[in-house]
Amino acid sequence: MEINHPDQLSVEHPTPPGDSSSLNQNGPGKQDGERCSTSGQAPEQEGSLHPEKGAHDVAEELSRQLEDIISTYGSAASPRGKESTSETKEQPPNTEAPDNEDVDYEETTEEIDREPTAPEEPAAAKEPVSNKEQKLEKKILKGLGKEANLLMQNLNKLQAPEEKLDFLFKKYTELLDEHRTEQKKLKLLLKQQAQTQREKDQLQSEHNRAVLARSKLESLCRELQRHNKTLKEETLQRAREEEEKRKEITSHFQTTLTDIQTQIEQQSERNMKLCQENTELAEKLKSIIDQYELREEHLDKIFKHRELQQKLVDAKLEEAQELMQEAEERHRREKEYLLNQAAEWKLQAKVLKEQETVLQAQLTLYSGRFEEFQSTLTKSNEVFATFKQEMDKTTKKMKKLEKDTATWKARFENCNKALLDMIEEKALRAKEYECFVMKIQRLENLCRALQEERKELYKKIREAKMSEKEDQVQRTSEEEPEPSVSENEEVDAEEANSFQKAVENLATAFTILHHPEFTPDQPTERQLAVNGPQSGSDVTHQHPETARLNHPSLPADSGSPRPPVGAQAVAEGVCEATPAPTASCTPAEAELQSQGLPAENTPGPKPHKPEANTSGQAPLSPAQGSLSVVEAKYDISPSPESEGDSAVVPGCESREQPPPEVTDIPVGPSTGLPREPDACLNGVD
């Protein structure tokens, strides 16, 4: 079992370098993929104008960062290869060292083997033969196993004790050899274990580097994704431009199609002419081949005739040899004649052979031309078939593109309609905003006018107080009535308190509260709590669009400024605090009744007309209502121009009448104002 372990370790030993190489290769693989993506984006960027040069510079910076990562983290494999080569060089001296150690170990084991041999001889001579000892031996043999059983069987077969000792000695030597070999293997395995631990440490360091490289690569990937998003936006812009180009290309493509069709017709006519010429050439070739066959038959006949002539000549020669003595002269003449004829026939044969070679060359030329013509025909047919396929594909693509253009046109028209609606809504909201701005300006002018009036009234009050004090001093010096002084002081205190309350109401009316805008998701109860019960009742009975026009306190979708809610709360609080003599109680009447003043200027209650709500006339803002209440409270004398117009409170006026403008309020001095000490005026300022 122990022998198999070194084999397994030796098999597993070379695997870690491969793993490290794979780990090292994972990083460059990703980097190559990213380079491919950047290189794939590069040709798109080359065709763009000057704004796209920045994107190209970003891609170059990312590629530089990738190269830096490769140079830092990819160079980890090179020192490892050097270490492996150095370890392989160091192995031969290490392998020689265990041999010397084994020699020393063998000497020590031989000395140990010599010592037990001496006591074994007397032990073998004094073996007991009792049953108990045999049972013990059997138990021991069972514990040792099959090898011990085999040893005992072999020993029992041997009878002489010397033979048994020799057998045991041989077995012992074999076991020693096995033990030594196992120790050698153990040392080698220990060395391999040390090497594997070193490699493991190297792999861990490389893994850490790979993790760092991976984190950097992930950051680079994120940057690339951002860059790709920008490129996508640019490509969308390009696509819009390319749609216009595509229309031009389609027109150009149609013109090219017409040209191609004309060229195809011309080529078909040329092909017909070439087919006719090919048929003519084929007929000519057939005629030439027939002539060549006739010539070959003629030559065969000539050769046969020559052979017959040669046979006759041979016969004649034999006869001439017999008659040689008789006709030597005739024989010579005939011989010369025959030699001349043979020379002539040879010349004719050479000429015929040359003609045969020439005809064969012509045949090869004609056959090659015919094959070339057939190849050109096949190529032209293939080109025509491919062209038809491409035409079919282009027609399909054109149909798809036409469908896409129709869908995009429909979307474009819908978008234009939505834009027109939005523009109209924007114009309406702008008009509303201008109206609110005008109202705010009027209120500011009114506030300034009231402040100027207040200053003048304060001056007059001070003068009146000074004159009254002087009169009182003179009267007290003359008559000195104590109860009248106390009564005057009480009246002054009551008047001061009422004036202070009026000033506080004015301050609350002109305070601008910045409330959060209401969203459609918020409940109506909160809107009613802020806008008051009157606005809530009007909104419930009216259409939402008319409610927005008639009640500016309602939240608008366009985010237009709303009037402050504090003025409404003040007016409503006054109405609730005082007992209502009639069903239609106004804030002005409530304030006047609470102070004990008659409400002469306020008109009687008028029925509420819901038809006027839809007429488009906006009611007064809460600030204007509070100002009208102040006018009614202090009986501001109107100017001669506005004597016919009575002071109207927004809660009691009819919807059909237009709201009073700022110019209707008089700026002149008023009568019947209460007396106020100077201490209350500083707080209001």
UniProtKB/Swiss-Prot annotation:
Residue ranges with Low complexity bias: 575-591
Entries under Pfam families matching the protein: Taxilin
Residues bearing the modification Phosphoserine: 477, 484, 486
InterPro entries, A to Z: Taxilin_fam
Keyword Coiled coil part of the UniProt annotation: yes
Polar residues bias spans: 18-28, 612-627
Matches recorded under PANTHER family: BETA-TAXILIN, TAXILIN
Quaternary structure and interacting proteins, as annotated: Binds to the C-terminal coiled coil region of syntaxin family members STX1A, STX3A and STX4A. Has a preference for STX1A.
Protein task: Promotes motor nerve regeneration. May be involved in intracellular vesicle traffic.
Name the UniProt record assigns to this protein: Beta-taxilin
Organism: Mus musculus
Gene assigned in the entry: Txlnb
